[in-house]
Every structure is written in structure tokens, then in C-alpha cells.
């Protein structure tokens, strides 16, 4: 099938909006911090003057990168107090890296003397570093995103709600190809014995990711807007959240074949009803949760509006969607709160 969306389109809202509204992502990735510390304690270190290289794959605005990368830097420095360290934050070229640089100068920064951060504006499903240059890699809640949409899926906005058939097969195929591409490039870039610590959206064997309730609400809102003439049918057909939450079998299946040893693989979860418990208690869940939902859906959804729409028209459609969704979340917050399933992998590059 031909692609309907080119690779390399940023899906996160910039200007710090995503960074300020990504509490669930950090909660989901926290379980991997111990694995990151363990990896930093054992990965091979380079001979001087070559710096150790830590790769951060999918940094977005950087808010959720400071704490885990501090774990990585501290772990490496515990072994060599003056080790020079490069930290490469990677994301799509359209990503807004400005908030990341601001955070690096703030109190939450991992920076210390001899640590050198920089950014790489390229897709993580392609080459990023030279051969055998990377020592430790980290990625949090990124690798379930698809490089592009291989097919339109009318009347559905989320892969876990798509029925078995050609569309679901196309999404699964794109996900599998992306995952293999990521592993192939990292296997090339890592030194022997280098490690990756990765977290991502996952599905249980029964096919559920824990976010179905929210996305069913979204589907209902989109259908209402088409019925009311606020959204065109062709636009609605293209709107989709471009992710595939792999099962554990899908996550681990190609790993050893592509040059890695699996040191740890865990399936955990994070509950947004707990993450936003105070909001539920005081009746403000919709007010507090909607910015998170908007941060992850605004660009993926509304880039598909027809090109003839004016700026004001596009803004009106977008605001109408989130106003309607706010009402649905407020009416049934427990159904909207996601119970995300999360995979954690610790992988070691086998000797060539």
C-alpha cells in the first residue's frame, strides 16, 4: 500500500505545551529508571579522550528527559568521575527543541562539568550516529509511534479499536518494519556490550492497551462533528492516532536476530486515574486531563484538515473538537482515564 502520510512530521505540540502536559508519560517510564542505572554501571567506557555517548531517542520538549538522563550520567560518573560524556537528544527535524535547551539551563538539568548535550534532528527509525559510537541508549514512550500512516482507517482513530482485516494488517506491518529499522540502526551504532533501555506503549495478549475508553470517546466526537457539518467526511476518515502498541511477543520477537541479548523485559502499567487522583477528587479531571490529551492528539489529528481551510477555520474546528471532548470527559471521567500498558526492555549489544 502507498503511504498516505510522509515520514518526518512532528506530532507533538511545541512551545513547551507538550512538556507541561506529559505527566502520564513520565509516570509510565519511571519503572525503567532502575534498569537505566544498572546499564550505566556496566556498559563499556571509551578510552580517553573519546567521550562516552548517551543517546536519547525521542526527546520532544525535554521535560521527561532530565531525570532519567541524570540517572545515566550519574551512573557513568560513579565509575569515572571525570569521564567526558556527550548526550545526544534526537527527534524529528520539525520538533521544537527550544524548551529542551531552556530546561538544560534550569534546576532540573542533568548538566555538570564535562557533560556536552546536543540535538539530532532525524527520525529514530534511521541512522543517527557512526558505527560503534553509542554506549548507552534511552527511549521513553516513543517507539510505539509509527513512522507514517500506511492506510486510511475510516470510522476508527486508534489501532486497538481497528477490527481484524487489511487495515489492521497494514498498521501492524508498518510497526514491525519500524521496530526492525530502529533495532538494526542501533545495533550498528552501539559498541559491543553497549545497552539500550527502552519503554513504550504496549498491548496485553488480548489486544487491549488500556486507552480504549478515551479513544472511543474521541471517535464519538468526530462522528458527531461530521453529522453536524463541522468536520468533512474525508477529513474524518484521515484522522488517526498513528501508533501501534505492540504485544510483548511483537516487542521481543526480532531482538535476538538483530544482534541483541535481552537482559530484562517487563510489562507494567500506569493509571491516569491515580496520576490525576486529586483532579478526580475535586471534580476538575476534565480541565486537568484535556491538556494532556490535546498535547498528544492535536497535531496527529488536525494536520489532516483539507488544505482549502483558512487558519481561522482550522482553529475553529480544533477548538470545537476539544470543547466537545471536554464535555464527554467531564460526564464520565473514569471511562476517559487511561490505564496504559507499558513495556520496558533492557537490551545488550552482543559482540560482533
Where are these regions (language model features)?
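N-terminal charged/capping segments associated with class I S-adenosyl-L-methionine
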Residues: 1-117, 122-132, 145-159, 163, ...
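Soluble or luminal CAZymes and related metallo-dependent hydrolases
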Residues: 31, 174-178, 243-247
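Hydrophobic beta-strand segment of the Class I
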Residues: 137-138
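Short catalytic micro-motifs in class I SAM-dependent methyltransferases
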Residues: 141-142
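A short glycine-rich, Lys/Arg-flanked "PGG" loop and its adjoining helix->strand segment in the class I
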Residues: 152-192
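Substrate-binding/catalytic lobe of Class I Rossmann-like enzymes that use SAM or dcSAM, i.e.
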Residues: 192-312
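C-terminal target-recognition/interaction regions appended to catalytic cores
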Residues: 284-352
